[in-house]
Design a protein with these regions (language model features):
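A "functional boundary" signal
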Residues: 2-14, 19-339
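Alpha-helical transmembrane signal-anchor helices
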Residues: 13-28, 336-374
Length: 374
């Protein structure tokens, strides 16, 4: 009789173990990737504080505007130029229309100043912001119209001019994305960046320029090394340069199929963009794309692509809006499909669990009856 009891007890535990295992197999899900919670935590905290960072920027803008309006008539044209340049810098990655307004103001003020350096500076800023808004032809026309006198212009003005002009051609190549014109635009962009090296003294910027040239020549390993050197020497308060370096390192790692490293840099870039109230950026879109295509994290990808679309719309970047607009319905549609599958899976799991629970109860009753009979 003792043997019968032991046999039934063992049978009971085996049935319980099998059913419990099946239950957990049906209800548990694999995490998309190991550091999901870390990424989610960093991004969630930054996004929660996004409005606060934007308000800080608006407060700075109001302060500069108030300073400009105080005794404006008594200010020299050089002073007006500097204050308007400060406003331009605040807006150039925040609002296209406002940045364009202050760029045109700078050109007007520069025309009243007897110095070629001011006009080159102003037109360089105008060309840069036109490209940010997707007006590549107008940007090239504006920058091409500048008369460059290398013997008399300050080195920093010349460096900014050639770097900005080179970036316009590189951005145009990225926008065109074809085998004919893109290679031509990249070549011109590299020639302009190479010209800037003669006027640079800052080591971080030199590494950045050399890294950009290597990247456009498809020398990924060399480019990555140069960008990392630029990042090590970068002024961490220069949020614009920091974002460029981080997002480009992410892009390079993505090309090298180093997906986890790419995500790491995209997160760093996106958090930096949020904290600096940057609306004109590629980091959030890049992060969303990586999470969607390489980590199957559709929920996060949908959230971040929505953020990217809102930022691009706020800034007024036509070509960014178009690119993100092609991704948005894909991500959101996939999210809806997955939620539908999850609901169906939950219903199926519930039915399956109920059936196994009934089987377990019947098995227990049967074992108890047999033990009593035995």
């Amino acid at each position: 009789m003792q043997e019968h009891k032991q046999k039934y007890i063992w049978g009971f535990w085996i049935i319980s173990f099998v059913i419990t295992s099946i239950f957990y197999m049906g209800c548990s899900g694999e995490e998309p990737f190991g550091n999901k919670e870390e990424i989610a935590g960093q991004m969630s905290l930054a996004l929660q504080q996004k409005d606060m960072y934007c308000q800080k920027k608006l407060d700075r803008i109001d302060s500069i505007r108030n300073f400009l309006n105080v005794n404006e008539k008594r200010r020299t044209d050089e002073e007006k130029f500097q204050i308007n340049a400060n406003l331009y810098n605040e807006f150039k990655l925040y609002s296209f229309d406002s940045a364009f307004h202050y760029a045109t103001q700078l050109c007007k003020i520069a025309s009243s100043i007897d110095s070629a350096a001011y006009m080159v500076n102003a037109k360089t800023k105008l060309g840069y912001i036109l490209a940010r808004g997707g007006f590549f032809k107008e940007a090239i026309d504006s920058l091409s119209s500048i008369r460059i006198e290398k013997e008399t212009l300050p080195a920093q003005v010349l460096a900014d001019y050639y770097i900005s002009f080179g970036r316009v051609y590189h951005d145009l190549a990225d926008y065109a994305k074809d085998d004919v014109f893109s290679s031509k635009y990249n070549q011109i962009g590299n020639e302009l960046l190479t010209e800037s090296l003669s006027y640079l003294s800052d080591s971080s910027t030199i590494y950045y320029v050399r890294g950009k040239i290597a990247l456009k020549d498809d020398k990924l390993a060399e480019s990555k090394q140069l960008y990392r050197q630029a990042l090590e020497l970068c002024d961490m308060t220069d949020t614009e340069t920091l974002s460029v370096l981080l997002s480009t390192l992410a892009f390079i790692d993505r090309r090298l199929e180093l997906n986890d490293e790419a995500i790491y840099y995209y997160v760093k870039a996106a958090v930096n963009d949020i904290r600096s109230a940057t609306k004109e950026s590629v980091s959030m879109r890049g992060l969303a794309t990586m999470l969607y295509y390489h980590k199957n994290d559709v929920n996060r990808a949908s959230e971040y692509i929505n953020e990217a679309f809102e930022d691009a719309t706020f800034y007024g970047t036509r070509h960014r809006i178009n690119v993100i607009g092609t991704l948005l319905p894909v991500f959101v549609g996939e999210k809806l499909d997955i939620e539908q599958v999850k609901r169906q899976t939950f219903q199926d799991s519930l039915i399956l669990t109920s059936i196994f629970a009934i089987i377990l109860i019947v098995a227990i009753i049967y074992i108890l009856v047999q033990m009593k009979i035995g």
